[in-house]
Amino acid sequence: MADDVGLNDLSCYGGDHTPTPNIDALASTGMRFEYSFSATVCGPSRCQLLTGRYPFRTGMNSNKTDTMPLAGTEIMLPSVLKQAGYATACVGKWGQVSWDNRPAPPWGFDESCAFLLSGKYWSAKYYNNNTEKNLANVEYMPDVMHTFLVDFITRKQTQPFFLFYSLVHVHDTMFRTPDSNPATKSINGSAEFYADNIRYMDKLVGQVVSTLNSLNLRNNTVILFVSDNGSTAHYKGIPDTIRGQLIDGWKNTMKEGGARVPLIVNWPGVTPAGTVNHDLTDFSDFLPTLAELGGASLPQGVTLDGTSFAPQIKGQKGNPREWVFVERNGDSYARDSRYKLGNDGLMYDLKNAPFEQILVAATSTDPEMILRRQRLQKILDDHPAMAKTQ
């Protein structure tokens, strides 16, 4: 899982600025999803992905720490997969539920090498299997996390494993990477270092694939690459464009660019190579999808919001969801394959204007518009956004 990487940041989605050859290779030999939706900020997105439940159910509707679910109150994806015999590990950023007992049980991770919050690159604190450590002056957090990842995969290569790899990149503040040109005079946070961080993230993705290949695990391993929310490139003065078209919205907005994120799935010999899937998915779908792929039973006695897209990963039609729901700190919207309705009453026709250029008048007398609005409003009524937290 990348941090703050939007569609515009990846060349396989038409991003105009920095080539991402390793991520592109996953897409060209796997499946790229066009309409995958997160929450608009990291904490709610990650909590939704790991629990299969919308923010109004878990309480995690913002990045406020007092909204984080407490240990033991939610069943998370690693716990589900452990019951099917999987070794589990969390590597990288931890910012979706409380840090009680670190990512160890009851959240379901056997092992962890993680840091709190975001944007930790140099001179920071982290936890290796719950032991607090500090980076040495020359250590780069992404490399430390990656070294742990390679060690875990190597040790667990003879058994099924689930690895939640939460990359540091490309959350602010953008620092120079070990690969940055030493002669670059730009200050931290600059557009030049943004591109460097995109490239370094892409390099790490390529190294994961190389590790799996070297251990002869690649054909038996499903890789899912996704981001936790939309991009922040515009804060650096970098236009959020795809093939020259400006995306409407970015991280922490309810516009299309805030929650529509990259999703690439690659499973050699199973996922049809080079395919583009136009089904709707949202982050509640990951738990049932990975449970199905891993032969695990879904938790009982809990409401799950997700729909498995495991059949689509295998090249089958499956049972695509008809709508997605996105919530952020009192705001929400429901979106189907063509229309989007927010709890502010604004409705958009996205068919020929994918970034919300066409507003559907609330007073429209078109029977189709009335029916579509009613259907989407019913979804919003059935999924009440939590009140805004201060």
Predicted regions, residues:
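Formylglycine-dependent sulfatase
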Residues: M1-N343, L350, P354-K388
